[in-house]
Amino acid sequence: MDSSHYNPTYDPWNSPYSPHLHPPSAPLPPPPPLPPPPPPRQSHPESPNLYGRSTQSNGQRQDYLHQYSHHRQDLPPNTVVNQPTSNYYQHPPPLQQQHQPLSLQQQQQHPQYIPQQVSYEPQRISQPLTSSIQCTESQSDWVGFNEKRLDSWTVDSGPGRSRVDDGPSRNYQYDYSRNSSGVNRGLDGSSRSRDEFRSLGYARKESGVTRTEGNYQARGQLKSESDRYVRGLGDGNRVLSSSVGYGSDRYGLTVSRDVTRSSASREGARETRNEGRTLYPEKKDDYYHSEIEQYFDRGRREASNELNRTPRKQVQKKSALLRLETPRSYKNSRENEWSRQHNHHNGNGKRFNSNSYRGKEHLGHSDRGLVEKQRGRSPVDLDISFKSNVLVAKPVASPTSAGIRSGASVTPRSIKARRALLSDKNEKVSVTERNGKLGTHLSDEISVSEGFRRSTRQTTASKNEKEPDSHSTPSSSDSGGKLNKVRFVNGVVQDSKVKLTDSGPEASTHDTEKISSFCETLIEAKDDINVKHGINTEACSTEEGVIDGNQSTLKSHEDVLDRTSTDCNAGEALLPKVMEMDEILKTKTTINTSPGKLPVSWPTVADLSGCSEDMDCDEDMDCDEDMDCIPSRNIPMMEVNTGFEERKSINSSDGSLGYGGKDFQKPYLDASIYFNREDPGDKVLAKSDIGGIEDDNKRIDKNVDSLSPENDSSRGRPMGLDSPASLDIANVSLDLANSNNSASGDLANANSFTVGTYMNPMVTSPDKSVVFQMESKNLPHCKNTVNAPVENVSGKGYMETTPLNVAAETADNMDSEEGKQTCVNDTSSSLTKVGVKGSSNVLSVERTGGCSHSDESDLAMAVPSEGCMENVSTERLVPDEELILKSYHPAEIPCVDSGSDSRGLKTCLLEPNVSLSKDLTDCARESLVEQDVSQRSAIFCDKLPSLSAFVTETTLAIGINGMSGNETVTDTESGLHEIQPCTTVCKLSPEDRFGYGSSGAIGSVRSLSIDKNLEKDSSKVSSCLVSDNSVSPCHISPLVAVNEEIQNKISVKANYSNSQDGIKHKEDNCTESVEVETHEEKAKLPGGTSKYRTPVTNITAGSGGDSLFLCDSLSSSRRRIRSEVHVSAVVDETSKGEEKSKPSGGIVAVRRDSVFPCDSLSSSPRLSRPLRSEIHVASMVDETSKSIEKIESSGGTSEHRTPETDIVAGSRDSVFPCNSLSNSQRLSFRQLRSEIHVANMVDETNRVKESQNGDSLLDTLQEQIMTSHELTQPGSSAHCDLVMKPMGDPIAKLTDITSDVGSQEKDLRNIAKTDTFDGEAVSSDGQVSGTEIPGGSGVRVSRSYSHADVKFALTHVKEHVVSVPHRDPQSKTSMNSKYEIEKRKKKPNYSTQKSYPSSLPYVSDTKKDANPPIHITKRHTWHRKSDASPSSFVAAKPLSSTLSTQQKFPKVTAQSNNSYVRKGNSLLRKPSHGSPGAALGIPPSAIQLNHFTVEDKSTGSSNMVDVDNASSLVKTGEIATLERQSKPPSDSSTSKLSNAIATSSGKCALSYSTDHLTTGLPESIMDSATSGEANFPHSGGDTLKTSDTLIQTGYASDCQQKRNPSDLDSSNLKRMVYVKRKANQLVAASDIHDVSQNQIPSSDGYFKRSKNQLVRNSESRCNQSISLPDDALDTRSAANMVSERPSSSAFSDSGM
């Protein structure tokens, strides 16, 4: 079983590790010693038998090792050795040899138990891996490595239980060596990988966290123990010593640790570890030190040999401790190992020996069984706790056990609490698999309170061992708290171990500790000191102390919430932390699992803030963990961020799992993480609190009641207490659960609920405009604020959190007497309150650091607190999604605190800012959690009143006091009545959700608030306008209704003028005060005024230099949002120039350099990673094209007419992806990400052009999805009007055109000046202006493909539809396009001369004339026709690449004199001019008449190319030859093709002479011709295979343009390109442009594809040897990615 376990572990680990390991693998190649380890391994096989992995896994392990060796190139030579190598990696083989007897003993002694362990582990790991496999390759690497390491310990622990001393020693040793050299290497590789992923947007963290979490869970207990012990012993301590975060990192901040390792490399890691070892018992450490030195220096072989020589090492005692924790080893060895490890860990000698391992042993065994049960479905569960420094494990009722297992066991299994968070995430993912289990988990975990008591006991015990390790350990322990994670519990649990509430606090403390582990060093001492108290968390989170007692519970809830949120940010820096927290949360949360507690949003907020802040780093905390927070924002916000990031990943998993209660709980945790930072120094997260609360409604209530006031009192701890927020959250959840149980009963149980799970929030994606206040400076600086907003944004839509705290606090103060103030403080950390959209989704986004109102009854109350968008009722919340914006500049932002609470005001006011300022001032720490919660916190949290009240009552009182700084909090229940500074909330009115929260001078952007109109849903979005530096999150434009409202509101063109006055909302609907405030702020925008026309979209126009805006609308996915935020932050930082935001579509316009993804990013969970990528891309693009991007927007005013499309027009450099990234879950993350990456490339290449394009793409996707689905239909017109007002055809076109918009360089400008742009300009809303679209004159992007594939609706501009070849943005947007492009890349590109307007979609039948064929494309349908699989590209492509009205497609009469020349076994179509494709010279486009299905009857499958696909290809500028089916189409099929290709409006009429059909080329062809790219996916059967010949759009475009006019005759069309299919069939693709143009004599040669397909490059003329312009290259990259997908099914899978 272990083998299986390990195999999965290794698999993920190796996979990611392998690339990195390969280099290390060279050093590692000292597998020659590994062959010696094989003997130990073989002798150890007994131990593997003990493990149940050696024998059982000899083959598996070998296989795994094969994988591993593949990954680890040095290992491949030894398969047998591989097995030893695996052991070696896992455990120093010398150790194994050393302990062969022990191993045998253990094996003999406990052979069957270990298999159980193994069984458990594999399941656990495999499940987590499955759930987190995404990240498996990235983060999991190191996670896997850690797992392996721990697993090695675990394995040794299992087998080494007999050989207690040796086993642990060996394990430890091996683990270390593995960790040091293997892991370090792996970390060098893996760590690098992790860093890469980290930079990638935390993809690894998100996925990897999931996977890591799972792995940690899987080996969690082992690893919990092992790692805890390792950390405590040598590994943990040395890790801690090397970097404070590491012990914690090991679990939650594993990344940080790994990072250090990667930095230190083997040596550094070894040194660190050795150092740690020195810290830990010397004998083992020394042994390890020398061993590791040898191991590292000589390579693993030597180390193995040495270890083999010295199997005597009693590291196994450590392992025993680990085994105890992991409950793998047998009692004896466990005792020895446990006591020994524990002693080592504590450095206390054998303090815990007898009891520790006795309890541990029992615990370990039971726990393992339990874990197995959970994963392996083994019913055994243990109650493990430390009493008097003794770890006691008691069998617990299996249900509890299951719960523990699931939550604690899995999480604790990977004792890294952060890893636990990962586990949590994995669990979420896995939970999906085991939802029933999850329910059990909830129950069990609730019963785990017992476990918490245990944990408390453990805490006492662990406390001793935990000092260096305490944070990390407690985190792990907490996860395992119920599990038997002694370590984590150590720090905090003690106080609140027993009572449920306490267990909540315990969890909270654990979580806090996790957080602390993030700030490990800082908290380390504190934790040890305060192990008993939440205080110890204070180090990390001021809240801890406050949270003690009830607060602790609250904190636990917060933790839970935090964890829940983890998903959103998990990928980010917070990943590990969140993992840890999540794990704890899982254990604790599950314990506290009270479906009623839905403060899931809270976590989102926290999550988001964490994410956005990269909470990873507390001020003290090491920021290694995720790249985000290296500055280590001080303030709890940091903590939150950490939690958030991890949280985010977890949330992602959670979202996937969507297991009922647990999901919700995790969000709690997230929230708690995010709030708890009040003081930079006290970063202990209060997240535990929320987590704790989460479990019980009553507990929550209690906590709320007691906590809220405490919060106020705690306030002193500036936000020390997240409790209030968490309480409120809990209350909200509670109420929500109770009240909304029917409505949001789901919520409690539902995936959707999991606020933490962005996936579910995706459901509410419309609402989900997260607001993240993010100060771009701050963000880059690791500002809590920035991150928080980002985090919030990314965290699913709960953006309430960040701003929530302040506003919430003030709101709470206003609404609830209770000191929501704390909330306010937290607000800063939980800048955004994400109104959870969708009812069930985390409704309670409220949490802003404790900002729930005291109203317990109102779940929403908590939400109200500040952005606590606590959708008290999820559903209500959903609409309510108000953007909470916290101002970036704490000082600047007077807390608009809706709450009339003086405190809230105070906090909100600059004064709070000041307090915040201290941290904020440096911007490095904008710790939201200042006592005042600082303006940022206050930003708006304006108390969202209770559930119902929330909308009403709170209405976002966020009035930002804007420049005036007067607190405009108008808390009125109707948020409608604008906040005083209406400006903050343009109009709080629900419809206006657009509240701009910008404060002019102050720059406080408090907008937020959704008001009660939440119900109206119309203004889901509360958009905050940020003035100079502050950034305002976009309001999420949720529904059509909102759209209309926004329409009206959108009137709110927030005109930013340089004048200091804040944004001026031109919104007609905006209340006067808004108007006034707006005026105040309107000047705020440094660069000209920006109008928000977009109705629904809540784009924030950022003005000032650095602020970033994240569209609030970002998909509910947390991750994505978080990524976006991070990107924004990065962009902001990099391009500090003023960036005008174009409000359009939820896109945030970043000031100059920064870019923001549209808020609209699709909510679909799948998008989360892609979004992140997008954002990163945006960031890159911004940086690269800072100037370029200035898009007319920078100096002048930029209006976004696109309603849904949230394109951000950055002022100069920033680029924003459209908010409209498709909601659809169909778009796979990868696709989106790829698209985004493509966008990145494109952006870089055509910075401005692409940048717009990317936005357009995103817009298109989202708009397509959102607008088409909801906006387009009802709100479409509204949006349209609003958005497109200048253009005249707004949304209808928008949806279609969205993608087109971004495509050209001009498009950026177009976005900015969509109205004015002529010719190719595409309006921001994605409709191409076509030739000059005067105010929407003539060119109506007529085709709006309903949010389905065509974002690219081609618009026939004026007379002809011109599709400007967009780089690939739309392609990017459309996964299909992407994949297509990738495929095309693989195939020779037919350069297509684009003389046809690229806007023509590939709709042959639908579009016969130049008018944009409005072919009905199913957005998610890859295949236009069921028979034509090739049209899989159709789905997401916004084909309407900017219609260049400039070029008209000359009508081409294709003569269908199709002569086939037989070459080889296939007929090749003679490139006759009659050939449609040839005549056009755009074989791909001609052939790729996606819409008109080109059927190759001869092949029996239709070659269908989606018009959409073609359009997007055109847009992409790449024409992929449509791969005809294996047999060249017969004349009949050709005629079909020609028919299909009928030139739209006769522009490029291709007629086959045979058919003499002068059918207008389908616009798709036209487009492809215009764009110079045609995708010719030919479906071999259902597979949509693109010829993969990418026509270089740019070049082809030019060629076509040149050629088409003259050469678009049948002769040109005649030219066909044949692609050899897998089936050994040649597909004829007619090159539209290759024939006529003699520029490049088309080579009829075939290019051999990787798939053994010949692609004929008939279009080479124009292609110029397939030289691709940058666009084409970008497209190629996308195409390569696409082409990698072998079949349309793949496309559809990813794209649908």
From Swiss-Prot:
- Coiled-coil stretches, from where to where? none
Give disulfide pairs as residue numbers: none
Q: Which residues carry this modification: Phosphoserine?
A: 378, 708
The annotated regions of Polar residues compositional bias extend over 52-61, 170-183, 1389-1398, 1658-1667, 1677-1696
Top-rank taxon of the source lineage equals Eukaryota
Q: Does the keyword Phosphoprotein apply?
A: yes
Key words, A-Z: Phosphoprotein
Region Disordered: start and end of each range?
1-113, 151-194, 258-284, 299-376, 419-483, 688-724, 1063-1090, 1184-1211, 1319-1340, 1361-1429, 1658-1696
Compositionally biased region (Low complexity): 96-113
**Which residue windows does the record flag with biased composition (Basic and acidic residues)?**
267-284, 325-340, 358-376, 421-436, 695-704, 1184-1204, 1361-1370
* Segments of skewed composition (Pro residues): 21-42
Matching entries from PANTHER family are given as: CCCH ZINGC FINGER, ZINC FINGER CCCH DOMAIN-CONTAINING PROTEIN 3
Its recorded name reads Uncharacterized protein At1g21580
Origin species, per record, is Arabidopsis thaliana
Species lineage: Eukaryota, Viridiplantae, Streptophyta, Embryophyta, Tracheophyta
